[in-house]
């Protein structure tokens, strides 16, 4: 389950407590189970072919259909990151600085884990480690950053209303939060 660590040393591990803190940012965190056994088996692989990615996406389309109906999402893809990817650190570097997006950043972590950092309205900071079967929606214009945990492994479904709004717009905010994971 998700873990929220605040700059003041407070740690939350219960979804209700985490959701209460994230509500200050209008960030949504949900638990979406993966019930298809074949999908769970595929997700054990370190990397996936394009065909395997499509099988996984199709098996999870119930969630995509829900997002299409409720919020107008138009597209989704599956990103698979692991240590054997060439230039992984370079790829991730553009998200490890404080930034915003013109569109919501919506992720459904289906394997591995990632860390979203946030700047709260009072200027304090925190980091949320999200794990398999957790869905997060970071609203447009929310100041945040992202990095992988020390395992450097994640499989995440990305949902888009448009890909045009998903370019990072960097801010000058210095990340003060002492990350507990190696980047």
UniProtKB/Swiss-Prot annotation:
Its cofactor is Fe(2+); Ni(2+). It is an enzyme of class 1 (oxidoreductase). GO terms for biological process: L-methionine salvage from methylthioadenosine; L-methionine salvage from S-adenosylmethionine. The keyword Nucleotidyltransferase does not apply. Coiled coil: none annotated. Fe(2+) binds at residues 99, 101, 105, 144. It catalyses: 1,2-dihydroxy-5-(methylsulfanyl)pent-1-en-3-one + O2 = 3-(methylsulfanyl)propanoate + CO + formate + 2 H(+); 1,2-dihydroxy-5-(methylsulfanyl)pent-1-en-3-one + O2 = 4-methylsulfanyl-2-oxobutanoate + formate + 2 H(+). The record marks 104 as: May play a role in transmitting local conformational changes. Disulfide bonds: none annotated. Monomer. This is Acireductone dioxygenase. It comes from Microcystis aeruginosa. The gene is mtnD.
